[in-house]
């Protein structure tokens, strides 16, 4: 989900498998709690990722498994294409806390959500990123009336550096009622994600490109009158 606490700060390094422009990268994060777009999804979690890149195309598998007994499990697949400052994406978002949420169910009861997105980096001198995501399919994509919601999310964010610390600040909004997706109540436009991220990575000497990082995310959700402080470790290969 899209989304990724450490990935917002630390890029995934490419590893040895390179052939005709194809490369692979991966890693895992350990987080004190898992928040997606300002909304709590689970407690402490392990979040692995694997990316294959070929030219301007990339395919990423990302997951999250809760350490507690809540049963929360997530598996996302994202296909992305970068066209200059614009990145277009299609993602299959699958998360479940119930035994009857079967992965290979794609009918009206499907626990999957199919989301399309677009992100635009304004310029190198002004590295603001404007992003829009909309869910097109999924049983849970409903508004308070039970109608298809086409749940959408808009975010404006900007990375910057303070001495040797990588920072990122931004705000995320929901433009219309998406009660079943974001659990922020029966309302239309609202701000649900105001965040400030900070992190730093180090190379592991003698480990052939391995990196370790530490990050913190301060998250406000005005729609829920909530605030959270998340910390974690990032491992990249």
Predicted regions and their residues:
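Outer-membrane beta-barrel "beta-signal"
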Residues: 158-160, 196, 202, 225-237
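Short loop/turn motifs that connect adjacent beta-strands in outer-membrane beta-barrel proteins
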Residues: 14-23, 56, 85, 89, ...
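Residues that define the transmembrane beta-barrel architecture of outer-membrane proteins
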Residues: 22, 42-46, 71-75, 110-114, ...
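Membrane-embedded beta-strands of outer-membrane beta-barrel proteins
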Residues: 48-50, 77-79, 116-118, 154-156, ...
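Short glycine/proline- and aromatic-enriched beta-strand/turn motifs that initiate or cap beta-hairpins
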Residues: 14-67
């Amino acid at each position: 989900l899209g989304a990724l606490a450490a990935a917002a700060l630390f890029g995934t390094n490419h590893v040895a498998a390179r052939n005709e422009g194809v490369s692979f990268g991966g890693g895992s994060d350990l987080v004190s709690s898992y928040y997606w777009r300002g909304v709590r999804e689970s407690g402490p979690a392990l979040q692995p990722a694997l990316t294959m890149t070929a030219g301007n195309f990339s395919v990423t598998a990302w997951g999250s498994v809760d350490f507690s007994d809540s049963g929360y499990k997530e598996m996302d697949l994202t296909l992305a294409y970068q066209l200059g400052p614009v990145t277009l994406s299609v993602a299959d978002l699958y998360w479940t806390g119930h035994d009857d949420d079967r992965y290979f169910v794609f009918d009206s009861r499907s626990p999957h959500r199919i989301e399309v997105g677009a992100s635009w980096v304004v310029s190198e001198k002004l590295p603001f990123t404007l992003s829009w995501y909309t869910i097109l399919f999924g049983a849970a994509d409903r508004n308070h009336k039970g109608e298809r919601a086409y749940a959408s999310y808009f975010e404006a964010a900007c990375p910057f550096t303070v001495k040797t610390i990588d920072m990122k600040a931004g705000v995320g909004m929901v433009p219309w009622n998406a009660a079943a997706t974001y659990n922020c109540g029966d309302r239309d436009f609202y701000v649900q994600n105001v965040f400030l991220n900070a992190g730093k990575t180090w190379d592991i000497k003698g480990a052939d490109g391995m990196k370790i990082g530490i990050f913190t995310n301060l998250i406000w959700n005005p729609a829920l009158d909530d605030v959270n402080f998340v910390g974690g470790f990032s491992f990249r290969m």
